[in-house]
């Protein structure tokens, strides 16, 4: 038996760069919609703004790379939130948590 990881169906390496960018955009939009129900809006916007300031403006990385780094940070934040035993939807948020009102738009540059 070959111990190497098998390529899942549909991931033959023939995907285009455009499909990867589309995946990134879709994933970011979905993550932001979920995150707003679990993390303070201010935190979401600050993570985006700090990511943009550091990766895009200071380091000169591409917009896609900046979005990818933001995605990584937000995934870690959500993982920690859930690992601590998320009770947001069941018990509601405590101070500094979810704010009432309609969900905010995605961070600048992600719409």
UniProtKB/Swiss-Prot annotation:
Keyword Membrane attributed: no
Gene Ontology CC annotations of this record: host cell nucleus; virion component
Compartments reported by the entry: Virion; Host nucleus
Pfam families associated with the record: VPR
GO biological process: symbiont-mediated suppression of host innate immune response; viral life cycle
Keywords carried by this UniProt record: AIDS, Host nucleus, Host-virus interaction, Inhibition of host innate immune response by virus, Viral immunoevasion, Virion
Presence of keyword Mitochondrion: no
Gene3D superfamilies, A to Z: 1.20.5.4730
Positions of short motif Nuclear localization signal: 64-71
Chief location bin: virion
Protein purpose: Plays a role in nuclear translocation of the viral pre-integration complex (PIC), thus is required for the virus to infect non-dividing cells. Targets specific host proteins for degradation by the 26S proteasome. Acts by associating with the cellular CUL4A-DDB1 E3 ligase complex through direct interaction with host VPRPB/DCAF-1. This change in the E3 ligase substrate specificity results in the degradation of host SAMHD1. In turn, SAMHD1 depletion allows viral replication in host myeloid cells by preventing SAMHD1-mediated hydrolysis of intracellular dNTPs necessary for reverse transcription.
Protein name per Swiss-Prot or TrEMBL: Protein Vpx
Organism: Human immunodeficiency virus type 2 subtype B (isolate EHO)
Upper classification of the organism: Viruses, Riboviria, Pararnavirae, Artverviricota, Revtraviricetes
């Amino acid at each position: 038996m070959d111990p190497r990881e098998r390529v899942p169906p549909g991931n033959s390496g023939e995907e285009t760069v455009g499909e990867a960018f589309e995946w990134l955009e879709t994933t970011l939009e979905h993550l932001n919609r979920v995150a707003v129900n679990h993390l303070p809006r201010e935190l979401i916007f600050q993570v985006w703004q700090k990511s943009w300031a550091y990766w895009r403006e200071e380091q000169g990385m591409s917009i896609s790379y900046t979005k990818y780094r933001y995605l990584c940070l937000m995934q870690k934040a959500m993982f920690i939130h859930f690992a601590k035993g998320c009770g947001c939807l069941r018990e509601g948020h405590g101070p500094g948590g979810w704010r009432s009102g309609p969900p905010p738009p995605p961070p600048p540059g992600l719409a």
